[in-house]
Amino acid sequence: MDIKLKDFEGPLDLLLHLVSKYEVDIYDVPIVDIIEQYLAYIATLQAMKLEVAGEYMVMASQLMLIKSRKLLPKVVETIEAEEDPELQLLHQIEEYRTYKLLGEELALKHNERAQRFSKPKLELIYDDITLKQDKTVLDVFLAFSKVMAEKQEEIKNSHTTIKSDDYRIEDIMTVVEEQVIRQKETNLSWFFKRAGSLNEIITIFLAALELIKVHRVYVKQEHNFDDIILRKESA
């Protein structure tokens, strides 16, 4: 089974998604938290042996610089707005959001005009392998990134040897689905916490995504940053 995750449209698209989860003004977001989530996302892609585009790595290095400045003791210094990397980043995100909203509005008007003056196309395009990048999948992936970061830290601080186990996605899909059927709904974190290795966590994640993709389980999240809940019926 080959599962691929489409990239965001770019690093700013990923940052905008992370910022929007806080539902506050861009300039009021906890920038260090945003940076840590971004870096966890990149680290997770690398742990899963997925290719990370160069532009994401360039942004990661810029974010690490901003984070280090935020965590260092305060030094009295005057920084011009155009030289402040944090402020520059927030300006970039705000500008990207403006253009993205404008693009979505233009696309909507184009579709409305096309429907008014032409017959609808009967062509349907299916993509059986690549998971489409929607909010549900993104939120599941971000929740997974957080767990991966915690598990990697746990293993790093442990003196035990983790054996390399082989986990089949199809087998884990059955385990996840049977648990959801029994309990009606189960937190995704419930499965992660019971995993004994990074390999098992990765397989659980891929199994959950595949179940969501084929509509054998559905996702519920009451509020941003709440646990991801897997359920048998759509909300």
From Swiss-Prot:
Subcellular localization, as worded in the UniProt entry: Cytoplasm
Keyword Transmembrane helix set for record: no
Any one GO biological process: cell division
Gene Ontology cellular component list: cytoplasm
Highest taxon listed in the record's lineage: Bacteria
Protein purpose: Participates in chromosomal partition during cell division. May act via the formation of a condensin-like complex containing Smc and ScpB that pull DNA away from mid-cell into both cell halves.
NCBIfam families attached to this UniProt entry: PRK00104.1-2
Protein name: Segregation and condensation protein A
